[in-house]
Structure formats: structure tokens, C-alpha cells
Curated annotation (Swiss-Prot):
InterPro entries: Enolase (IPR000941), Enolase-like_C_sf (IPR036849), Enolase-like_N (IPR029017), Enolase_C (IPR020810), Enolase_CS (IPR020809), Enolase_N (IPR020811). Its EC number is 4.2.1.11. It is found in: Cytoplasm; Secreted; Cell surface. This is Enolase. Keywords: Cytoplasm, Glycolysis, Lyase, Magnesium, Metal-binding, Secreted. It comes from Chlamydia felis (strain Fe/C-56) (Chlamydophila felis). Disulfide bonds: none annotated. (2R)-2-phosphoglycerate binds at residues 165, 335, 364-365, 386. GO terms for cellular component: cell surface; extracellular region; phosphopyruvate hydratase complex. Pathway: Carbohydrate degradation; glycolysis; pyruvate from D-glyceraldehyde 3-phosphate: step 4/5. One of its GO terms (molecular function) is phosphopyruvate hydratase activity.
Length: 424
């Protein structure tokens, strides 16, 4: 193995797309090459996610500073990975996990560990003169993912009364990422005009989608279908719909109800929406610990649409394995900062793929200009990606990166939607 060692790590506190602090990390090798990473942050988080370390010092950034995590990068993690071969990703990650010593990385912070993990991999890629996706995935990484584009924001991503968090479109009729982006942009701008015509607000939420005051989830879906049609596309054939319910955010753990409704009623609501709209994917339709609800949802809809677990799995290989053994869901959302290292992210994806579950690489609501997830989606051939709407530069950066990768790959690149229920 080529020997190039980690010589230094630089880090600083920066701001994410919501104006809250996060970490920037730069890993430098003794060959003079380097890699950089900015760590994202979520708003609706699963209770079993790896811990994002915050300062809780109310005199700075309303307690959301990350100076403790920053200090851990410089004073704790740098000394233990300094001198380690930059190409030994598994060793780098395992050293950091061992240094933390907790199941959820609460001692040093998943944000500190992930920043180094990703920046180290990028430094390795730079040392070899390879694109990041090629270094991570190897010569068989060539699939451009179908995007899930969050055009209407609700839930914890917007203050507009909508129960569900994300109302998305999927350009399943596209033949390239370039065409998929164009289709999404057309629908986005058509939707904006429709909202203006109805005197509805066109301000956007955390992920760049519109956040109008609407009366129901159905009204949001009606608007999306109309926008698709007025853009000249066929709903369900060229562009399908997808939901992220983020059901844990409106689940009462004491009464075990969803705003007064049982899990059976919640599943009925979702099944009815699937009957009335061209929905082929639902994420977090039930709360993360409502296992009876998940079992029923998968039994009722698992043969018809993609059932995605986010909070259910939190990119944790152990939880994914448990869910697969119980037959819960049929797809896994992948967020590297939920687990905290590139190695564990890879393990989660490979486990899901080996068991026939699809995967979707995903951003967080608090993002930066970092485009890592675009490369990872191609590296792991996930075939699907969630990276927000067609506005806000931290979202657009990922689409622009995907189009650049597509151009680099040329005829080898394959735009492929991994959702087996697309267009049904």
C-alpha cells in the first residue's frame, strides 16, 4: 500500500444554511495534498442518531456553538490519527471511534469525527489525483442517481401548518441527471407561478422548497400534480411524487397516536393518498419506535411503493440489520452524519443492498456548500438522492456537482432510478 501520512488537521467553526455553527475540517498529508469537508446538521433528528456535539453556551449562537467539537478535532483526534496512512480509511475511522469510546459518539461528537473522516478520504483522493466518487467507489461507480426534489416544505422545515415535512417530485422519465434537473426546475418555477396566482406565499423553507400556508397535505399534493401537468409532464409516468412524513414529529409517545389517530388510521391515510396520487415513495410514514405501525405499513404498501426508513434506521448498520430481520420498510435513507464515519456509512449501504433494500443518499436541512453527498451517491451507486429543491445555493451545489460528474463519466455514466416501483 502506498504510504502517505496524515501530517496535520485544520478546523474552524463556520455557519450552515440556517445560520447555525458547524465544522469545517481540512486534513493535510505529508505529500502536501489535502481534503476538506463541512459537516451538515439536521432539524428533525432520530433519537438514536450519533450525537452532534454542541456547546450549550447560551452566550454564543443561542447555545449551538461547536467549539467543544472543534477542540476535540485539534486536541484529541489529531494526535491519534497523525502519522496514519491516508489510504487506510478503515483504520483512520476505527481509531477515532475507539478514541471516543461511546456507542453514539457523544464524547467527542459525531460532527468532529465525521469532518475528519470525510476530509481524510478526500485527501486520499487528491493524493491519487482521482475524483472523490472514483476513489471511494472504484471503477464500477457509474450510476447517476434520480433526485427527490423537495418542492413544498412543511413540518419542522417550515412554519406553515403542513403536517408532513417534505412533498417531493421525482423526475423518473429523465434519461440523464442534466435532464432531471431541468425537469425539476421547470416544475419548480411553474409551481411558483401557481402559488402567486393563488396569492400564496412563495418564501422557501430550510430545504429550498416553497412553504405556503395550506390547509392539508392533499392540497400540497394537488398543487404538485397541477404544476407537473402545466409544465408539460405526465404525473406518474414522467414525474412521480414522494413524501417524507417525518411522523415522529407529530407522534404522541404517551397516547401512541398521530394527532389523535391510531397507527392503523395513519396507515389508512397513507394508503388513501397513494390511491389518489402518483406516489411511489414514502419516508418515515410512522414514528421511529412505532414498530407495529411500521409492520402494518410495510405489509399494506411494501409491494406497491418504496417504504423508506430514516429515523427508523439512522444509517446505523445494527438498526438496519434489525429492521431487515423484521421485514420493516424496503429502503434506507443514508445520512453520513447520523452515524459519523465514512466506513460505517459504507457498511450501512452495503448491508442494505445485499438484502435487497434500496438506498437514498440524503442531505440535512442544515447544509453547506459541501457537495460530498453527490459524490457518495455515485460512489455507492445508490440510484437515488435527496438534496432539496431547485433553489438555495447549498442545494443547487449538489445538483451542479452531479451534472459535472455526469459530464466526466461520459458514455460510461448511467442515469438510473433504483426505486423498483417507479412509474407503476
Amino acid at each position: 500500500m502506498l504510504e502517505v501520512a496524515i501530517s496535520d488537521i485544520q478546523a474552524r467553526e463556520i455557519l450552515d444554511s440556517r445560520g447555525y455553527p458547524t465544522l469545517y475540517v481540512k486534513v493535510i498529508t505529508d505529500a502536501g495534498t489535502f481534503g476538506e469537508a463541512c459537516v451538515p446538521s439536521g432539524a428533525s433528528t432520530g433519537i438514536k442518531e450519533a450525537l452532534e456535539l454542541r456547546d450549550h453556551d447560551t452566550s454564543r449562537y443561542q447555545g449551538k456553538g461547536v467549539l467543544q467539537a472543534l477542540n476535540n478535532v485539534k486536541e484529541v483526534l489529531l494526535p491519534v490519527v497523525q502519522g496514519v496512512n491516508i489510504f487506510d480509511q478503515i483504520l483512520i475511522d476505527s481509531i477515532m471511534v475507539e478514541a471516543d469510546g461511546t456507542p453514539n459518539k457523544e464524547k467527542l461528537g459525531a460532527n468532529a469525527i465525521l469532518g475528519i473522516s470525510l476530509a481524510a478520504a478526500k485527501a486520499a483522493a487528491a493524493t491519487l489525483g482521482q475524483p472523490f466518487y472514483r476513489y471511494v467507489g472504484g471503477c464500477f461507480s457509474h450510476v447517476l442517481p434520480c433526485p427527490m426534489m423537495n418542492l413544498i416544505n412543511g413540518g419542522m422545515h417550515a412554519n406553515n401548518g403542513l403536517q408532513f415535512q417534505e412533498f417531493m417530485i421525482r423526475p423518473i422519465g429523465a434519461t440523464s441527471i442534466k435532464e432531471a434537473v431541468r425537469m425539476g426546475a421547470d416544475v419548480f418555477h411553474t409551481l411558483k407561478k401557481l402559488l402567486n396566482d393563488k396569492n400564496l406565499a412563495t418564501g422557501v423553507g430550510d430545504e429550498g422548497g416553497f412553504a405556503p400556508q395550506l390547509k392539508s397535505n392533499s392540497e400540497a399534493l394537488d398543487l404538485l400534480v397541477l404544476a407537473i401537468e402545466k409544465s408539460g409532464f405526465q404525473p406518474g409516468k414522467e414525474i412521480s411524487l414522494a413524501l417524507d412524513c417525518a411522523a415522529s414529529s407529530f407522534y404522541d409517545t404517551k397516547t401512541k397516536t398521530y394527532e389523535g389517530k391510531s397507527y392503523q388510521e395513519q396507515v389508512e391515510i397513507l394508503a388513501d393518498l397513494c390511491d389518489r396520487y402518483p406516489i411511489d415513495s414514502i419516508e418515515d410514514g410512522l414514528a421511529e419506535e412505532d414498530f407495529d405501525g411500521w409492520d402494518l405499513l410495510t405489509a399494506e404498501l411494501g409491494d406497491a411503493i418504496q417504504i423508506v426508513g430514516d429515523d427508523l434506521f439512522v444509517t446505523n448498520p445494527e438498526l438496519i440489520a434489525e429492521g431487515i430481520s423484521k421485514g420493516r420498510a424496503n429502503a434506507v435513507l443514508i445520512k453520513p452524519n447520523q452515524i459519523g464515519t465514512l466506513t460505517e456509512t459504507s457498511e450501512a449501504i452495503q448491508l442494505a443492498h445485499n438484502q435487497g433494500y434500496t438506498t437514498i443518499l440524503s442531505h440535512r436541512s442544515g447544509e453547506t456548500e459541501d457537495t460530498t453527498i453527490a459524490d457518495l451517491a455515485v460512489a455507492f451507486n445508490t440510484g437515488q438522492i435527496k438534496t432539496g429543491s431547485l433553489s438555495r445555493s447549498e442545494r443547487i451545489a449538489k445538483y451542479n456537482r452531479l451534472m459535472a460528474i455526469e459530464e466526466e463519466l461520459g458514455p460510461v455514466g448511467l442515469f438510473k432510478d433504483s426505486n423498483p416501483f417507479s412509474g407503476e
